Structure formats: C-alpha cells, structure tokens
C-alpha cells in the first residue's frame, strides 16, 4: 500500500466536496505537509488558484475574494505556526460574514507533544472563532469515503457566515507516484464523481418572518440607520427611507449615497439630536457602524422600538436596546416590509446636513488627508470599487465625504485591525476584475508591506493611495497623554514608500498638490497595473481639521 497515494485520494475527496459547496477560489501557501491537499487542488479544474508566501496575507487575500464573490473561499497551509497566521482573517470573517474554509495540514497524532519538528496542537487552536471545527483522522481505508464527504458537506452546508477549520493530519511519505491504492475506496462514492451536487444536502436556514405589525410602525416617526451592506441593498434602502419620509443616517459602508451627508459632524449638534429624540422607531439595516457621534447617538437613543436587520446571526447592538433582532437578507426584508409614501417629518436635520457639507467644502483646497477624504468620490474609477482602510482614514471619509449610491465599498470593519488590508484589497480586485481604488494609512501599509507582491497580479487598474501622516494619527483624536503620545501611541516611522514600490516593480507617484494627484490618477486608470500613490501630509492636520469642523458644526 502506498501511503502517499492514499493521502492524495483522501485529499481529492475533500477538495471535490468543496467544489460541490460553491468553492471556486482556493488560496495556497507553500509547504510540505500540505502536499496532498495542494496536489489535489492543483489537479481539480474547478478551482481558481491563488498563491502567496505569507499565510497571514493569504488568509486576508481569501477574505477579500469572499467579500466580492459571496462564496466560500478555501485556504491551504502547512502545519505549525503557518496555521496560527490565519487567525486574524478568521476572526474578521466571523464578524463580517465572509465564508472561509481553512484546510490546515498537520502531523499525525504520534508526532504531537513529543518534540517533533513543526508539530503543534492544532485541533481547537482557533477556540470559538470558527463556526465549525473538524479534526479529521489520519487517512485510512477503514473509514468509508462517504463519512469523509458527508462530514465536509454537513459543515459547509450549514455554514451561513464565518469560517470552518478542517485540520488534516497526513503521515509520511508525502511524495511518490500514484498507483491503485485507495482507488476502490474512492470509487465507492459511485456516480457522485460524475454529478455536481453535494453528497449531503442540508435544508436552508429559516430567516425571520414578516413583522405583522409593520403596517402600524411604518406610519410612525422613524429613523433609518444604514450600516454595512451590499451596493444593491444600499440603493434599495435609500429609496425605502425616502418613501417613508424617514431620515437616513448612512455609514460610509452603506452605499446608500448618504442623502444626509456628514452625519458624524451634524450629530454633534444639539438641534439634530433633539429632533431625533422625536423618533418612535429606529430601524437599523446592517451592522459595523463607523462614526463616533453616530455610535454615541445610537447608544443614547430610546425609541419605543429598535429593530436591527442583518443576515449575520448573533447580537449586533452594543447599546442593548429593547426591540427586535431580525435575521434576514436586507433586500428580502425590504420586500416583505414595503414603505408607505409619507412626508418627511424631520426639518432641522436636512438643513444641518447641507450646512455641514458646505463647511467641509470651504476647506477643500488645502492639500491634506481630510481634504482627500472629502474629495475621494471625485477620484473613484468608473465601473469600479473602493477599498477603505481602517483607523483615521475611514473615519474621515465617513464624516467628510458623500459616496455615490450603489458604488461598491469594501473594508475590514469587523475587528477593524490594520493587519492584512493590502492583501484584502488584492482579493477584492481579483474576485471582481474591476478597477479598484484602495486607500490606507502609512502604518497599515507597513504592516502588510509584502502584500505588494500580490498587487503585481491585477486584472484591471488598481491604485493604492498611502496617506503618510507619519504614524497612528488617530490617537491625536483621543485624550492620550501628551508626553507619551508620540513614542507610545503615534510611533512615527519616518519612512517613504518609493523603494518598496520599486522592489515589487509597481508604478509610484508622490504628488505635491491636487493637480499632480489627478494627473497621476488619470495615468493610472489607463493600464491594468498597480500604481502606488504616496500622499505625504502634515502629521496632525487631518485630525485637527476634523476637530475644527466638529466644533463649527456643533454651533450652527
């Protein structure tokens, strides 16, 4: 009996089962112990293969692919700390709803806890973060193939969001020619190999029913809060709120067009919050709210009913309102709960939103990161998409810009880490094939710098804007101790990115004014390559501009 041959047949069943559950993209890191999985993936023509040498970046690449494709994405890594590097992407997927299938190769049980090389305790290492965890046995013909395929099908068939960890131990030898070992074991799956359906088909998940008293609540004074959702959902939510005559507070990720722009500014005005207190119901569609003032208002508001609609399961309200948690696809829920045409009940808020935007426009000429955040909608590629980083940049765009309704916006706003942002943006571009504008800060770019290798392979123009404010300037918005702020919070690195771009053979520009930036963008959108645009700005100007605008709008 050939151990290596049966390892590959065992792996082939696993990989084929994944294809029946909609997996098309598979991300592979180099490794020896994962050889059976890698070769099985390479031989399966149903997969689109992606490779990367850094497992942490690989996990985030898969995350980006899953964001756009809306399908589960598989990841193959070898044993040891390679597995641990997938933790950040797994955590993010669990919070934002992407489906990741982590296939982690492992040493067999007799090599664990005995000093064997590259052997760690992998089963259960991700704690409660995976939706499902499977610790497969060592490949053996004593276990029928139908057990293996049905185990995979059950985990994926019941997966609505988050990750599945499938730990796969393989004994040596890992290499060798294929023979007939295990062929009859594999063939016992019969004509399953010829069709395209799962071995085990799970019943679909039941979602929340129609709220029978909706006809009553839609006649009340309501507020719509729009969090993270798809571009198509964003347009529908905007129309729904407009028909109801309810004010819509749209997050940067809502893709609603933010009909009341600069919400994080005008929510700091007492006139706005006073008017919002008249709301009898708040309907929040989507989670992951960004703006600080929005979160403060959301925590303090006390309507008669607070409804949260999102297809992600679990509690999504850190303010713990009394109300209803409705698990449903947002577009489907809107169809079940049609709007009734009514006149807008808010008078003060539209005026404040207009005045807040005018205050922002009055400051748009200076060359700085706050002004870039406001102007970002002017720089979006046609038929393209936007990827927004974390920390200060997403807050500035949320507060100062107005993105087009239905324009795709992606981010990692689940755990909101700055790790893996470039890798995620690479996945977003690959899955969509669209021109992509990505914007991150300098520390975020440094954190995931080797992901520039992934950005060499794009199918449409990709522009990476690195806003270099020399450190974590978001801490300038917080009451951090002044004497310790620079050394222990901001951590300025005093670096530029020209040589990093050159190392990976990417185009690079460092504009000094808006005209140079716009010229660089026009050039970048012409060719299907990646262009790094480093925008060097005064360190605290962005945070200070936001604080000045907050003070100004609060007194309107």
Swiss-Prot record:
GO BP annotation list: menaquinone biosynthetic process
Gene3D superfamilies per UniProt: 3.40.50.970, TPP-binding domain
GO molecular function: 2-succinyl-5-enolpyruvyl-6-hydroxy-3-cyclohexene-1-carboxylic-acid synthase activity; magnesium ion binding; manganese ion binding; thiamine pyrophosphate binding
Required cofactor names: Mg(2+); Mn(2+); thiamine diphosphate
Domain of life per record: Bacteria
UniProt subunit comment: Homodimer.
NCBIfam families according to UniProt: menD
Protein name: 2-succinyl-5-enolpyruvyl-6-hydroxy-3-cyclohexene-1-carboxylate synthase
Lineage of the species this protein comes from: Bacteria, Pseudomonadati, Pseudomonadota, Gammaproteobacteria, Enterobacterales
């Amino acid at each position: 009996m050939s151990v290596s041959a049966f390892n590959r047949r065992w792996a082939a069943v696993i990989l084929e089962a994944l294809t029946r559950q909609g997996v098309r993209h598979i991300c592979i890191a180099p490794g020896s112990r994962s050889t059976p999985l890698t070769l099985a993936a390479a031989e399966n023509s149903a997969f689109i293969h992606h490779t990367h040498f850094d497992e942490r970046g690989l996990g985030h690449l898969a995350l980006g692919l899953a964001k756009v494709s809306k399908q589960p994405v598989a990841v193959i890594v070898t044993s040891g700390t390679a597995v641990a590097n997938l933790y950040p992407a797994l955590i993010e997927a669990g919070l934002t709803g992407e489906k990741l299938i982590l296939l982690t190769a492992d040493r067999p049980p007799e090599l664990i806890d005995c000093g064997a090389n590259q052997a760690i305790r992998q089963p259960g290492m991700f704690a409660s973060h995976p939706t499902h965890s499977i610790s497969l046995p060592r490949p053996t013909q004593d276990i029928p193939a139908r057990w293996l395929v049905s185990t995979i099908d059950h985990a994926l068939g019941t997966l609505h969001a988050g990750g599945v960890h499938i730990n796969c131990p393989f004994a040596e030898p890992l290499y060798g020619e294929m023979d007939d070992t295990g062929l009859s074991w594999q063939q016992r799956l019969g004509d399953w190999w010829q069709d395209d359906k799962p071995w085990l088909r799970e019943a679909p998940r039941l979602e929340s029913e129609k709220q029978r008293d909706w006809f009553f609540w839609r006649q009340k004074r309501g507020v719509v809060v729009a969090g993270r959702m798809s571009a198509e959902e964003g347009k529908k939510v905007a129309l729904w709120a407009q028909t109801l005559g309810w004010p819509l507070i749209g997050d940067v990720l809502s893709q609603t067009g933010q009909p009341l722009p600069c919400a994080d500014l005008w929510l700091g005005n007492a006139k706005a919050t006073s008017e919002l207190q008249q709301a009898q119901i708040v309907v929040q569609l989507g989670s992951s709210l960004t703006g600080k003032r929005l979160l403060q208002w959301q925590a303090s508001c006390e309507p008669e009913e607070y409804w949260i609609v999102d297809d992600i399961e679990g509690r999504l309200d850190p303010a713990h309102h009394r109300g209803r948690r409705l698990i449903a696809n947002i577009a489907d829920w809107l169809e079940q709960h049609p709007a009734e045409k009514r006149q807008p009940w808010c008078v003060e808020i539209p005026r404040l939103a207009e005045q807040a935007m005018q205050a922002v426009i009055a400051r748009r000429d200076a060359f700085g990161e706050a002004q870039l955040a406001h102007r970002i909608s002017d720089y979006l590629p046609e038929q393209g998409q936007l990827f927004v980083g974390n920390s200060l940049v997403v807050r500035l765009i949320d507060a100062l810009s107005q993105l087009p309704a239905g324009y795709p916006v992606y981010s990692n706003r689940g755990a909101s880490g700055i790790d893996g942002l470039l890798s995620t943006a690479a996945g977003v571009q690959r899955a969509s094939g669209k021109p992509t504008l990505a914007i991150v800060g300098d520390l975020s770019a440094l954190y995931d710098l080797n992901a520039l290798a992934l950005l060499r392979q794009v199918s449409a123009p990709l522009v990476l804007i690195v806003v270099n404010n020399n450190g974590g300037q978001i801490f300038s918005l917080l009451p951090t101790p002044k004497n310790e702020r620079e050394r222990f919070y901001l951590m300025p690195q005093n670096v530029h990115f020209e040589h990093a771009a050159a190392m990976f053979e990417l185009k690079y520009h460092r504009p000094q004014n808006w005209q140079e930036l716009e010229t660089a963008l026009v050039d970048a959108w012409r060719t299907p390559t990646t262009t790094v645009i480093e925008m060097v700005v005064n360190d605290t100007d962005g945070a200070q501009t936001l604080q000045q605008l907050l003070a100004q709008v609060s007194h309107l």
